[in-house]
């Protein structure tokens, strides 16, 4: 169960990132013994989610009612209109072919696409810091830090990926900046604190080689103002932003991820599988719950096997490192038609796929490139 946090346990949203020393202050970890692993130089540690009791499997479904769905039949008129729309979207394809071709044969096939989405949440802790600006410090003196899975946060909508960072309550400690040693500024590396550098024109000689007059760039001084620090000899510390102190704390990183498994049933036509994976289909079945179970007894055995394989893969990949929040599995019908047509004594082929009649034409005649016809 989630632990209710009081007002002192409020979670601060973070957006600051800075250069980090090799290890966190030992004083901080002495007060936070559960985070002592950071002393070994750990960048971040995954905290395993609490185990939850599995739900009960759903009842066996009656598939015949689902299979009553049918996509509209492909006709020669629809096939020609689909090709005309495709040609109109291409600058180098002749529309004459689409208007004059003779359709000889339509080979239709309906495919099934199975898709499994698993929306999960993982939590990682890491040590970080930011410039201290004299605001109140939420340190261990205010109480014990909550366990990372007890911290309540508002997550994104289901199946929408996101990453957010939060400050762990009661984990803060103020220390002198390790970069500038509490000065807020440090010596410029360009001029070593002098504020000036050797003139690049005369190389510090005050005069150019084989010339008697003084160097015009440095006015004969042999030195130029340092461009790195604008002549000040020092720079504001980039780590503490001139504040001289740093606020060290434990940071909680929460990642919401949507894992995807897809499978398209086998087909006998030569349309590329990657196009079919992205095709728009007609929804045949949808199952969404905190946990979904493998589909059984589907008329296409490959779909049932894909469902079993996808759920097993996601379970194995996420069980030990993330909390599954929601799962969704769908089956879609993808219509596919192979169109054989005749044009000027030759036979060609194109494919119409998806419910929105997308076209794949690999050998379309009368294509143009920069005004030249591709034969």
From Swiss-Prot:
* GO MF terms held by the record: heat shock protein binding; unfolded protein binding
Q: In which tissues is it expressed?
A: Expressed in enterocytes of small and large intestinal mucosa (at protein level). Expressed in chromaffine and interstitial cells. Expressed in peripheral blood and gingival cells.
Keywords, sorted A to Z: Cytoplasm, Disease variant, Nucleus
Question: Which cellular components does GO assign to this protein?
Answer: cytoplasm; nucleus
Q: Which GO terms describe its biological process?
A: odontogenesis
Q: Where in the cell is it found?
A: Cytoplasm; Nucleus
Q: Which domain of life is it from?
A: Eukaryota
InterPro entries for the chain: HSP_DnaJ_Cys-rich_dom, SSUH2_homolog
Please describe what this protein does: Plays a role in odontogenesis.
Q: Enumerate the PANTHER family for this protein.
A: PROTEIN SSUH2 HOMOLOG
Disease entry from the Swiss-Prot or TrEMBL record? Defects in SSUH2 are associated with dentin dysplasia, a genetic disorder characterized by severe tooth hypermobility, short dental roots, and obliterated pulp chambers.
Q: What is this protein called?
A: Protein SSUH2 homolog
Quick one: which gene encodes this?
Answer: SSUH2
């Amino acid at each position: 169960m989630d632990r209710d946090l009081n007002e002192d346990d409020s979670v601060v949203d973070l957006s600051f990132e800075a250069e980090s020393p090799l290890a966190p202050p030992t004083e901080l970890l002495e007060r936070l013994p559960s985070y002592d692993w950071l002393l070994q130089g750990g960048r971040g540690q995954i905290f395993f989610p609490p185990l939850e009791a599995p739900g009960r499997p759903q009842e066996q479904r009656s598939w015949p009612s689902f299979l009553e769905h049918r996509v509209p039949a492909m006709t020669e008129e629809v096939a020609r209109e689909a090709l005309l729309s495709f040609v109109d979207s291409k600058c180098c394809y002749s529309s004459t072919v689409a208007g004059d071709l003779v359709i000889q044969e339509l080979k239709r096939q309906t495919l099934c696409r199975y898709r499994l989405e698993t929306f999960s949440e993982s939590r990682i802790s890491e040590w970080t810091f930011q410039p201290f600006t004299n605001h109140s410090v939420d340190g261990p003196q205010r109480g014990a830090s909550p366990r990372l899975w007890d911290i309540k946060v508002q997550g994104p909508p289901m199946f929408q990926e996101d990453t957010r960072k939060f400050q762990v309550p009661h984990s803060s400690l103020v220390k002198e900046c390790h970069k500038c040693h509490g000065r807020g500024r440090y010596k410029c590396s360009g001029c070593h604190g002098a504020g000036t550098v050797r003139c690049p024109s005369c190389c510090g000689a005050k005069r150019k080689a084989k010339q008697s007059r003084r160097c015009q760039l440095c006015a004969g001084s042999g030195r130029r103002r340092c461009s790195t620090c604008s002549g000040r000899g020092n720079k504001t510390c980039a780590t503490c932003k001139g504040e001289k102190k740093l606020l060290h704390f434990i940071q909680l990183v929460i990642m919401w991820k949507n894992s995807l498994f897809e499978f398209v049933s086998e087909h006998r036509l030569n349309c590329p599988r990657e196009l079919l994976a992205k095709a728009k289909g007609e929804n045949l079945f949808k199952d969404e719950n905190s946990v979904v179970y493998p589909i059984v007894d589907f008329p296409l055995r490959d779909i049932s096997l894909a469902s079993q394989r996808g759920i097993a893969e996601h379970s194995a990949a996420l069980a030990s490192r993330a909390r599954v929040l929601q799962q969704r599995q769908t089956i879609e019908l993808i219509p596919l038609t192979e169109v054989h047509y005749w044009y000027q004594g030759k036979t060609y082929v194109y494919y119409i796929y998806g419910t929105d009649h997308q076209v794949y034409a690999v050998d379309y005649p009368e294509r143009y490139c920069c005004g030249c016809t591709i034969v």
